[in-house]
Amino acid sequence: LTDPASTSGNLLPRVSFTKVIGADLEDYFSRVVYTGGHDLSAVAVFEGQVDAAFVATHRLDNVLDRGIASMEDYVVLWSSPVIPQDPFVVNGRLCPELIDQIQNAFLSLTDSAEGQKYLKNVNASKFVPMTDADYDIIRDLKAAKDAKKN
């Protein structure tokens, strides 16, 4: 696992993957550790410090892009449902025109060379508008984890 506060590196595996294997992670694996981050988890697998890890795809891409390892060094055993990435938010008290300008600036990054360079630097292809409902999967995962505690 990556970090106790990580959605894709802790919460999602503890809820979704445990449904696949029919057991808690600590009962299924001989040892469960937190590495401190997705990149560190991918490197730990590559270096043989752990046998497997739950790593966000874009974080594995970071390790591959830096030349630390290649995709041939890994076998993907399970892929989770898609979850939304971290949002960019603004204060809702801003005037609607300014909010629209800020949103349009993000949504139009693909339209310029400078914007495309920024997207490449953050390992993204584009920004998309999100709604509160898009994050229901995160709320559902947390509710399922909390229910397991009780």
PLM regions with names:
Residues 57-58, 92:
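Short secondary-structure boundary segments
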